[in-house]
UniProtKB/Swiss-Prot annotation:
Highest taxon listed in the record's lineage: Eukaryota
GO BP annotations, alphabetical order: maturation of 5.8S rRNA from tricistronic rRNA transcript (SSU-rRNA, 5.8S rRNA, LSU-rRNA); maturation of LSU-rRNA from tricistronic rRNA transcript (SSU-rRNA, 5.8S rRNA, LSU-rRNA); rRNA methylation
HAMAP family, alphabetized: RNA_methyltr_E, RNA_methyltr_E_SPB1
Coiled coil location: 367-414, 796-835
Protein name: AdoMet-dependent rRNA methyltransferase SPB1
Reactions catalysed according to its record: a ribonucleotide in rRNA + S-adenosyl-L-methionine = a 2'-O-methylribonucleotide in rRNA + S-adenosyl-L-homocysteine + H(+)
Basic residues compositional bias, start-end: 868-879
Annotated function: Required for proper assembly of pre-ribosomal particles during the biogenesis of the 60S ribosomal subunit.
EC code: 2.1.1.-
Source species: Mycosarcoma maydis (Corn smut fungus)
Length: 921
């Protein structure tokens, strides 16, 4: 068989880069051109903003997205839509339109592009000269768009076709960029005339002449006739036109710059040495052209010899005239000055006198008188010009400010100017000497409370008396600020409880008096006093509120100053009263609801919130209040119990999640010890003697027993779940530590830290994060990992069920075969040999039924297998040779059988009979 020919179309485009692009997922083979350019010049890794012009289908965008840093801005533009590419922004627009520029400005905002890449080409197919000019024009248009968005020092990469306009483009590139280099990557086909120009270091000029980027001026062809006229006017002979001497200015002022002669010599000019008579040099007009065109100034004529006798013609001038090609700038200037002096000496040029200069300066000019209309027109023109000048000046000033602002934003030097704007003047507490007053937050909360409920006269008097305290006393102000901070923190917790179920469940546990932290062993008298104080307080106060009330009661005051005691007493009463009022508003009773149902009283303060919103808010606050664990023991009817169960479902879920996430360390200690309960201070409360401190039955902590039993059951079912628990268990088992040692470790200096006078938010933060770290061992981590590996090695539920079903079916088949074997064995009509053979067949059939029947392998009879006799190469087991004809016939046979309603089988199948050979009717 002949070898399969590789597909080759479009001059071999299906090369290795084509297959590499398909393997790596690039949309075009042109992506490797940018990859190789970036490998050589390394411009993508340092860029943060990139613009791809003529980007379809998106190969260069994929490369830019791959090599540029993360969070870079990449924008692609093309006439046709581009399929989305990760980390890029694309849109379809013409790069010559103003709409394209506006859309780019909207996307870039204040950014400037670090790199602009262009790999576009126009529609070709006409004359080659026209296609080359269209490509050069497209490149110049992309450059015009690039200079608008490029930052200083940016890079511009473009594709250029080799043509006569290539040098003009390079000249423009060199004027705008510091470094311009043309290269042809290996991925570019050799038959293609494309080359790539990498322009680095954009100069960012202040202004660019529009003609500089206009194709009509950049690619303009010079007329040879006009060049000849210019050379004749300059005094350059035709014999020197086209030579290096023709560029006289370059030869005079840049003598080191060598210009090669690429156009040959003039007709009839067989020498390279040209001499100029001195008198012709003196009388000529184009001095620079003559100095750059000729090699020597001779004094051979009679008129020229007279010049040698002049005093200005010294030996230095004669030496300079002998060879003009070796002179420098200073020598050429000396020759030009010598020419001026000789022209004055010969009378060709007349010197200007002082009287002539004065006459020229004082020359009078007759001014015609202007009529009234002309004066009005001149005045209007002057005013318009002045207004235009002022407008230009203002526009220039705004542009400068805008440029400075953009520069600051690019350098990240901006300062947010709206700091403090959200605080109103009435909240700044003007007149009390402080710039920021925390009392403003309390005033806002009080205003909201006034809108929700009418405050009684005695309450308002208490609030006013608490506000008008002596601000001059720093201690009083500090205590007042602490009280205000606590009030704001309580308001924050209330709002957080409305939003977050986890936070609400956590606060419910903290409010529970049973979860109060241990503060040491006290005497019976102190305990009795604490019990009396607890009975006097609100029943809703839990362990955390007890801490707050104890902190307020244990404050030390100045007993010498009676006024301070009075102020502090009023302040405490105001704080307690405000807390009580908040609880009353948060937990509306039946009386309060009845009061709300009555017509509202007339007041000077009117709420802007509707009654529906107020009722919804009160219902939310009521639901939060009844979520307290104290209400869970109340007897409810069936409907109320069902509603309470639905409301508390979220809280229970949140409590379980938080307990699993945050209290792993505490659970580990309790899991190891069994009956040991580890709190934030990590030690166990040791019970006292039963005779001295007997606990009544009604005060026994049943919830604690349930919690411990639940922990023990969880440990028994699932084992230890944390590394700390495993480490402590290993230490106990290996006799490295005893239970008494663990109890002793629970007593530390942290258990008796004085927390009086500390703010509530600080105590909450300490309770959450201030915990003792339990050391873990490498063996504990290894044990947990081994356990996790064992759990991971177990099959999933579906696989296990499938294996169980397969095993069950096998057992059923064996059981069925065993019953048949017993029946055969009980039959006395057959011999033992026949019984044995029949039983063996039954067992083999039952086992064979469990095995999967091998499918017949189909081999297509084409290619190397066409006309093959014997087993095809590479096939094992049963096989069947098929061909397209057989496939079509089988499909037709099935279709016909389905139409006739027949079942496929050997009885229905009939042999094929050629047409014309069947039986005649």
């Amino acid at each position: 068989m002949g070898k399969k020919q590789e597909k080759k179309t479009a001059k071999g485009r299906l090369d290795k880069f084509y297959w590499l692009a398909k393997e790596q997922g690039y949309r075009s083979r042109a992506a490797f051109k940018l990859v190789q350019l970036n490998k050589k010049f390394n411009f993508l890794e340092k860029a943060r903003c990139c613009i791809d012009l003529c980007a379809a289908p998106g190969g260069w965008l994929q490369v830019a997205s791959k090599f540029m840093p993360a969070n870079s801005l990449i924008v692609g533009v093309d006439l046709v839509p581009i399929k989305p590419i990760p980390r890029t922004i694309t849109f379809a627009e013409d790069i010559n339109s103003y709409k394209c520029r506006d859309q780019l400005r909207q996307i870039l905002k204040d950014w400037k592009a670090d790199i602009v890449i262009h790999d576009g080409a126009p529609n070709v197919g006409t004359a080659w000269v026209q296609d080359a000019y269209a490509q050069s024009e497209l490149t110049l248009q992309s450059l015009r768009l690039a200079v608008e968005f490029l930052t200083a020092g940016g890079t511009f990469v473009t594709k250029v076709f080799r043509s006569k306009d290539y040098n003009n483009l390079l000249w423009v590139f060199n004027q705008l960029f510091k470094k311009v280099e043309a290269t042809k990557p290996s991925s570019s086909r050799n038959v293609s005339a494309e080359i790539f120009v990498v322009c680095q270091g954009y100069k960012n000029p202040a202004r660019i002449d529009p003609k500089f980027l206009d194709p009509r001026h950049v690619f303009k062809e010079l007329d040879p006739a006009s060049l000849a006229d210019q050379d004749q006017e300059a005094g350059v002979p035709l014999s020197l036109k086209g030579t290096s001497a023709g560029n006289a200015h370059a030869n005079v002022f840049e003598p080191k710059k060598i210009r090669r002669n690429r156009e040959g010599y003039a007709d009839g000019d067989y020498t390279l040495f040209h001499s100029l008579d001195a008198m012709d040099f003196i009388k000529g007009q184009d001095v620079i052209g003559m100095l750059g065109s000729y090699n020597q100034i001779s004094f051979e004529s009679d008129e020229s010899k007279k010049l040698l006798s002049l005093p200005d013609t010294n030996d230095e001038m004669r030496e300079n005239c002998s060879d003009l090609k070796v002179l420098g700038k200073k020598d050429f200037r000396n020759l030009m000055n010598w020419r001026k002096e000789v022209r004055l000496a010969l009378g060709i040029d007349l010197p200007k006198s002082k009287h002539q200069d004065l006459a020229e300066q004082t020359q009078t000019v007759e001014v015609e008188e202007m009529d009234e209309d002309d004066q009005i027109d001149d005045e209007l023109a002057r005013l318009n010009e002045e207004a235009a000048r002022k407008a230009r000046k203002e526009r220039r000033r705004k542009n400068e400010l805008r440029q400075k602002k953009i520069l600051k934003m690019q350098l990240q030097m901006t300062t947010p100017m709206d700091i403090g704007m959200d605080v109103m003047d009435d909240q700044l507490g003007a007149g009390n000497g402080d710039m920021f007053e925390i009392s403003s937050g309390e005033r806002v909360s009080k205003k909201a409370l006034i809108q929700q409920a009418d405050v009684s006269d005695d309450e308002s008097e208490t609030i006013v008396s608490s506000q008008h305290t002596d601000d001059d006393d720093p201690e009083t102000r500090a205590r007042r600020l602490d009280a205000e901070m606590d009030a704001l923190y309580d308001e924050f917790k209330q709002k957080q409880s409305e939003r977050d179920a986890k936070f609400r469940a956590k606060q419910a546990r903290l409010q529970d008096a049973k979860n109060d932290s241990w503060h040491g062993i006290k005497d019976d008298e102190e305990n009795d006093e604490d019990d009396d104080e607890a009975n006097l307080s609100d029943e809703s106060e839990g362990g955390y509120d007890l801490v707050q009330r104890r902190k307020e009661q244990e404050e030390t005051f100045d007993t010498d100053d009676e006024e301070d005691e009075e102020d502090e007493r009023l302040e405490r009463e105001a704080t307690q009263h405000s807390k009580k009022r908040k609880r009353d508003l948060a937990a509306p009773t039946a009386d309060s609801f009845e009061m709300d149902a009555k017509p509202p009283k007339r007041s000077l303060v009117h709420s802007l919130v509707s009654d529906a919103d107020v009722s919804a808010q009160q219902s939310r606050e009521a639901s939060i209040w009844f979520d307290n664990p104290l209400f869970k023991d109340l007897e409810l009817d069936e409907q109320d119990a069902q509603e309470a169960l639905e409301d508390d479902q979220d809280d229970e879920d949140a409590w379980e999640e938080e307990q699993d996430d945050e209290d792993d360390a505490e659970e580990s200690d309790s899991e190891v010890e069994g009956e040991q309960e580890v709190e934030d201070d990590d030690f166990e409360v040791v019970p006292q003697d039963q005779e001295e401190h007997a606990i009544p039955d009604e005060e026994w902590d049943l919830n604690g027993e349930d919690e411990e039993a639940g922990k023990q059951k969880r440990i028994k079912d699932h084992g230890l779940a944390t590394a700390e628990a495993v480490a402590l268990a290993q230490a106990l088992v290996n006799r490295q530590i005893t239970k008494e040692d663990l109890m002793d470790q629970g007593f530390s200096k942290h258990n008796f830290v004085d927390k009086d006078g500390l703010p509530t938010w600080f105590l909450d933060d300490e309770q959450k994060h201030y915990k003792a770290n339990i050391p873990i061992t490498k063996e504990a981590i290894q044990a947990l990992r081994e356990r996790q590996r064992a759990l991971d090695a177990r099959p999933i539920k579906k696989v296990a069920e499938a294996k169980a079903r397969k095993k069950m079916r096998t057992l059923r088949r064996l059981e069925k075969a065993q019953k048949k074997a017993e029946t055969i064995n009980e039959n006395e009509d057959i011999s033992e040999k026949e019984k044995s053979n029949t039983i063996n067949k039954l067992l083999a059939k039952s086992v064979k039924g469990a095995q999967k029947k091998k499918e017949v392998q189909l081999v297509v009879a084409k290619g190397v297998n066409r006309g093959l006799k014997g087993r095809p190469k590479g096939t094992k087991g049963r096989y069947k040779m098929v061909d397209p004809r057989m496939k079509k016939e089988l499909r037709a046979f099935k279709r016909k059988a389905k139409r006739d309603g027949k079942k496929l089988g050997s009885s229905n199948s009939k042999p094929r009979v050629p047409k014309g050979y069947g039986p005649r009717n």
